[in-house]
Amino acid sequence: MEQQPLTLTAATTRAQELRKQLNQYSHEYYVKDQPSVEDYVYDRLYKELVDIETEFPDLITPDSPTQRVGGKVLSGFEKAPHDIPMYSLNDGFSKEDIFAFDERVRKAIGKPVAYCCELKIDGLAISLRYENGVFVRGATRGDGTVGENITENLRTVRSVPMRLTEPISVEVRGECYMPKQSFVALNEEREENGQDIFANPRNAAAGSLRQLDTKIVAKRNLNTFLYTVADFGPMKAKTQFEALEELSAIGFRTNPERQLCQSIDEVWAYIEEYHEKRSTLPYEIDGIVIKVNEFALQDELGFTVKAPRWAIAYKFPPEEAETVVEDIEWTIGRTGVVTPTAVMAPVRVAGTTVSRASLHNADFIQMKDIRLNDHVIIYKAGDIIPEVAQVLVEKRAADSQPYEMPTHCPICHSELVHLDEEVALRCINPKCPAQIKEGLNHFVSRNAMNIDGLGPRVLAQMYDKGLVKDVADLYFLTEEQLMTLDKIKEKSANNIYTAIQGSKENSVERLIFGLGIRHVGAKAAKILAEHFGDLPTLSRATAEEIVALDSIGETIADSVVTYFENEEVHELMAELEKAQVNLTYKGLRTEQLAEVESPFKDKTVVLTGKLAQYTREEAKEKIENLGGKVTGSVSKKTDIVVAGEDAGSKLTKAESLGVTVWNEQEMVDALDASHF
């Protein structure tokens, strides 16, 4: 029976229902980290809302989840005055500073006080304004009196609620930051693309929020912690600790690592604890914020011209060390970017021994004037990546000479060039052995074709011996050829051959990612595969068709089209097809959702222990292709735990929660019985 078109009244009602439902699911996923539905359930409802808003554009509201994805290109940022100033905090750098702060507070109040201690997130200070519970404005701190209006960019940050659980009008303050893992991935991508890298996660967050293209912001995986209210009039809390609880209750993401301390000794113990834990956190912190807990006492203490008297920010000492640059090595990535690395005298920084640091590109070396045998200060950016922070010029030898940049590829000796005003040097020889080897490494990697046994050493041997010249050649190798490689005996050769042949059955998104198309990551590859269905169809797609997809911008679209315009790519596709490598998407496409029959459909599954018949990745992929979701931890939301050999604490927790437990064979039987 043909579905009747919606009336305006019906569309209005349904859009309201969908917005409420989707905002709740988003809050559970991004703020509480407790998703209650599978991704594709959310996606299906989201698509329904998009369709309604497309047909009835007047129904689009500021709190609609469709307004998060970005797509607007802004001409600039308007000024955003703060009715209530965003004060900075006085800093403390030692135990003496913190104890002196406590002494001043107790002297002014006349009694001991309790303190609320919170982690000082190293991001960008933001202010969020809500009217009747709906997000209407987001701004940067600026000078504390006037910031910049970044509302459209903050709409793309998933942990910023579009609508609160209470219809109150309130302005809250907090920090927008970039998680460490996202920071590393972003810099790797920028380095590979010849762009300037960010010095640290704070700069990355700030730079992202000041992007004029909101679609770029949406891809940056920013997050937030909210920690105070500009005016507590609409709030019930009487203390800072209660305020954080209340902020969480009405929909904001707050940091759970806070602690209420009854004395300054407890405060110092908290500081020492998180100074040790700092490197284990998934986000960057640069200190601890200490606030008098009771608002009545805060009011009594008041403010100076610049800062509150009732709070102080303890700043951690920098994790840095001095060493000597002994050499600068250059390596070539799969897209031809030539990256310099400083080889240094080993030194301890942030608990680890460091002897190498990325110098990113030639401009970085020239900007800092880094030379061989220079004494330098290094630190860990985001507690992760060793960076050269400073050159100690006063210790430089009198006969020191500026570092001479390479002009030719260290591997194939082709001339190095700058493309399109990139900061990176590139080798543009498509036959460069280093690029081909890196491309082979990428092709067999875990998120690509996932071929076990083919590490960089083995692949380099294959190339050097003339066994492979491109990725398609892998599929024509024989076991006898594999046994000609160093340290590859009959059993290893058989294992590698079996792994290569098995990868032919992968769903095509792995192949798309493995081909190394510039700017196309694993997520974009899956979006492309799901929409176009197979590689030949994708190869014929126009930039307009590609850019119309959610989360796919012009850069990716142009890159994909350019890639498939190359005749050598079509020859490679023909060879892959000849080798019977699967070129189609095996996952669940939107139009097939209703037809799926599987015990895994709509279920949350956890895999634990050793599996004999599949690798963990293979099992995960098969379950997700049938509409299930595989997560890494057991909770009340888990439907099935598959327990392999030597299953440990996850099995114990599943049993204690009464979650259904399957052995591996039950999982295999369920996979075999599934179809769509």
Curated annotation (Swiss-Prot):
One of its GO terms (biological process) is DNA replication. The active site is at K120. GO terms for cellular component: cytosol. It is an enzyme of class 6 (ligase). It comes from the Bacteria. It catalyses: NAD(+) + (deoxyribonucleotide)n-3'-hydroxyl + 5'-phospho-(deoxyribonucleotide)m = (deoxyribonucleotide)n+m + AMP + beta-nicotinamide D-nucleotide. The keyword Manganese applies. One of its GO terms (molecular function) is DNA ligase (NAD+) activity. NAD(+) binds at D39, Y40, V41, Y42, D43, S88, L89, N90, D91, E118, R141, E175, K291, K315. Residues 595-676 form the BRCT domain. Its cofactor is Mg(2+); Mn(2+). Keywords: DNA damage, DNA repair, DNA replication, Ligase, Magnesium, Manganese, Metal-binding, NAD, Zinc. The keyword NAD applies. Gene3D superfamilies: 5' to 3' exonuclease, C-terminal subdomain, 6.20.10.30, BRCT domain, DNA ligase/mRNA capping enzyme, Helix hairpin bin, Nucleic acid-binding proteins. Its EC number is 6.5.1.2. Zn(2+) binds at C409, C412, C427, C432. DNA ligase that catalyzes the formation of phosphodiester linkages between 5'-phosphoryl and 3'-hydroxyl groups in double-stranded DNA using NAD as a coenzyme and as the energy source for the reaction. It is essential for DNA replication and repair of damaged DNA. NCBIfam families: dnlj, PRK07956.1. Belongs to the NAD-dependent DNA ligase family. LigA subfamily. This is DNA ligase. It comes from Enterococcus faecalis (strain ATCC 700802 / V583). The gene is ligA.
